[in-house]
Regions:
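N-terminal helix-loop segment corresponding to the beta1-alpha1 unit
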Residues: 1-163
């Protein structure tokens, strides 16, 4: 049997909800060793969704809990970064820096690290700190106004394209 194309690649997944976990799911399906890292206190918000969805989006991944606000959690994460190829995170801009594990710190530990920051509106610009979820994008684009009856409340779909 042929090895999968990303076999040997290690990914640290700090993302939550759906976009980041979907991204790392594809990497895992292609053979990457993905370690999903959840906050000890809250975990991934997607755990509050249907259990089958959470399990499906996180299949083929290993998991662990770390509190990056604590010295021990940060130290463990930084040791993992030394042996990782990719870090994927979905915090608002500046959160990783405030936790003491921003790009510059991680780069000092691993010059070859690929750092992927998934945000709704990018790392700079006027909307950078806004919440970034499907309903926000639909409202901002005007699509939400076009859903539902004319002159009535918008129809909030259960199908979230961008979240």
């Amino acid at each position: 049997m042929n090895a999968k194309p990303l076999a040997g690649l290690r990914v640290l997944d700090l993302s939550r909800l759906l976009p980041g976990p979907a991204c790392t799911l594809y990497l895992a399906d292609l053979g990457a060793d993905v370690i999903k890292i959840e906050d000890e206190a809250q975990g991934d918000y997607a755990r509050s969704l249907q259990p089958a969805l959470f399990k499906a989006i996180n299949r083929n991944k290993r998991g662990m809990c770390l509190d990056l606000r604590q010295t021990d959690g940060r130290a463990t994460f930084l040791r993992l970064v030394e042996r990782a190829d990719v870090v994927v995170e979905s915090f608002r801009p500046g959160v990783m820096d405030r936790l003491g594990v921003g790009y510059e710190i991680l780069r000092e530990r691993n010059l070859a690290l690929v750092y992927c920051a998934l945000t709704g509106y990018g790392q700079s610009g006027p909307y950078r700190n806004r919440a970034g979820h499907d309903v926000n994008y639909r409202a901002l684009s005007g699509q939400l106004e076009q859903s539902g009856p004319a002159g009535g409340a918008p129809d909030l779909s259960n199908f979230q394209v961008a979240d």
